[in-house]
UniProtKB/Swiss-Prot annotation:
The keyword Cytoplasm applies. It comes from Salmonella paratyphi A (strain AKU_12601). The record marks H175 as: Important for dimerization. This is Oxygen-dependent coproporphyrinogen-III oxidase. Substrate binds at S92, N108, V109, R110, G258, G259, R260. One of its GO terms (biological process) is protoporphyrinogen IX biosynthetic process. The active site is at H106. Its cofactor is a divalent metal cation. InterPro entries: Coprogen_oxidase_aer, Coprogen_oxidase_aer_sf, Coprogen_oxidase_CS.
Length: 308
């Protein structure tokens, strides 16, 4: 089937609506929308919820941009695409809660199509979701990964293990030699076996995000926290910033295509701190995080998992 970019765009717009409505219902605060246009072609709508009852900042961005040539970040691993016109569209979101016991979450689904006269279009889907806890709860990690596994299952037994590993490999801070969080799913360059199959999988990932995240929010939102937990949360948010600015392909793509900087950097936490050579107290919950975020087979842990 010929790729239907219009159909994909309509799904993405609905997905942004659905996620914003769901997060607002949980938090009690509303998103503020900022529509924007890109001079070189395209635009989008950025929605941000600030200082809510649960979420310190939640940003849900839709963008649809197009241009006459693919940017370097997109052709680095596919040089045959150089010189093609392109369309890129997607929904990307990051949620930073107030409560340090609630993890930060990120999700993204996207579609690219590159064309030139006399040649078949080249297209692919990408996306995924990942979780960045500050204090580790095994039952949360198990739920997150089982939700990911279950949505992958209709598409093949090998899909979840493959995209889990890709997520673990991708969200890795090489300069720190540590994982960003506990991962989830990550896929890119998906264009087989056909458009309908790939589009259905992208939809499953997009729709699965709230199913994976909101039960964790509900479970942790009433936990009491203080200055110690807050300081650790702000310190660990620094890792989030480092990854996005140094390693993230999506950030590089947006900046290199002349995307809207405010929307691209919407994923940044509103407050963050760095402290030179800081080390957590041995045996503390903060020290336990480094072990908790090590790559493991979360779906195989028992149902009665407890705090790690």
């Amino acid at each position: 089937m010929k790729p239907d970019a219009h159909h994909v765009k309509q799904f993405l717009l609905r997905l942004q609506d659905d996620i914003c409505q769901t997060l607002s219902a949980v938090d009690g605060a509303n998103f503020v929308e900022d529509s924007w246009r890109r001079e070189a072609g395209g635009g989008g709508r950025s929605r941000v919820l600030r200082n809510g009852g649960i979420f310190e900042q939640a940003g849900v961005n839709f963008s649809h941009v197009h241009g006459d040539a693919m940017p370097a970040s997109a052709t680095a691993h596919r040089p045959e695409l150089a010189g093609r016109s392109f369309e890129a569209m997607g929904v990307s979101l990051v949620v930073h809660p107030h409560n340090p016991y609630i993890p930060t979450s990120h999700a993204n689904v996207r579609f690219f199509i590159a064309e030139k006269p006399g040649a078949d279009p080249v297209w692919w889907f990408g996306g995924g979701f990942d979780l960045t806890p500050y204090y580790g709860f095994e039952e949360d990690a198990v739920h997150w990964h089982r939700t990911a596994r279950d949505l992958c299952q209709p598409f093949g037994d090998d899909v979840y293990p493959r995209y889990k590993k890709w997520c673990d490999d991708y969200f890795f801070l090489k300069h720190r030699n540590e994982q960003r969080g506990i991962g989830g799913l990550f896929f890119d360059d998906l264009n087989t076996p056909d458009f309908d199959h790939c589009f259905a999988f992208m939809q499953a990932v997009g729709n699965g995000y709230t199913e994976a995240y909101l039960p964790i929010v509900e479970r942790r939102k009433a936990m009491v926290w203080g200055e110690r937990e807050r300081n650790f949360q702000l310190y660990r948010r620094g890792r989030y910033v480092e990854f996005n600015l140094v390693w993230d392909r999506g950030t590089l793509f947006g900046l290199q295509t002349g995307g809207r900087t405010e929307s691209i950097l919407m994923s940044m936490p509103p407050l963050v701190r760095w402290e030179y050579d800081w080390q957590p107290e041995a045996g503390s919950p903060e020290a336990a995080l480094s072990e908790f975020i090590q790559v493991r087979d979360w779906v195989s842990l028992p149902d009665n998992s407890s705090v790690s």
